[in-house]
Amino acid sequence: MLAHAGYRRARTFFTPANAQSYDRLARSATFGRDMAWKREIVRAVGNANPVLELACGTGILSSMLASAGRHVVGLDLTFDYLRATQRKLELPLAQGTAEVLPYRDSSFGGMVSSYLAKYVDIDRLTDECWRVLRPGGVAVFHDFAYPSDPAVQGLWNLYFSILRLCGKFASSWKVVFEQLDDVIRESRWESRIQASLHSRGFTKICCNYHTFGTAVIVRAEKP
């Protein structure tokens, strides 16, 4: 049973109460950048097929991958988010965690995730990715990051202070708005996942920062 802090936090953040408003929030809270980052993920995974999306949520990225001709399989921790995906798309879905995947070895040509890495046990994630990917398979991870530029940090901190105030008027997102900035600051997931991927045997590992360093995409291949 998973009991680490990231798992508990994800359970607290993503609930039946906010599943229906997630898509709208993802667009507005990122000023539309969410779609731009997801387009980069689709480009990064290339022609890999089939593609497993971890933490598929309400199916935003899965829809984009399917439109690009990928055969998509989705997995998410929260049942109500999977139901939202099911209303949009016909694709195989499963409820579960990224650290214990319910799939056979070498099942996928690609694996993607968006907004997952800061919540998981990184080493268990990369172990499972290695197991379910075929040789030549591609893994793409995307999530928020704390910017390194002091000027951008100032704006970032101001934005999240405003977001905390907004939580007073959006009860289903209150906990997220109050805690997300601390989660992002403490995570530093991009450096940890690159080290873990390298240790596990992945090659061609690359890390690209986006939107003034506030988001990161890490890509790797299984030789």
Residue ranges, per PLM feature:
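Class I SAM-dependent methyltransferase SAM/SAH-binding core
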Residues: 52-100
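A short SAM/SAH-binding and catalytic strip from SAM-dependent methyltransferases
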Residues: 110-123
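C-terminal alpha-helical "lid/dimerization" subdomain adjacent to the S-adenosyl-L-methionine
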Residues: 6-9, 145-196
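Conserved class I S-adenosyl-L-methionine
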Residues: 1-46, 60-61, 176-178
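A short glycine-rich, Lys/Arg-flanked "PGG" loop and its adjoining helix->strand segment in the class I
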Residues: 123-138
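A short acidic, Gly/Pro-enriched loop at the edge of an enzyme's catalytic core
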Residues: 99-111
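Core SAM-dependent methyltransferase catalytic element
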Residues: 200-223
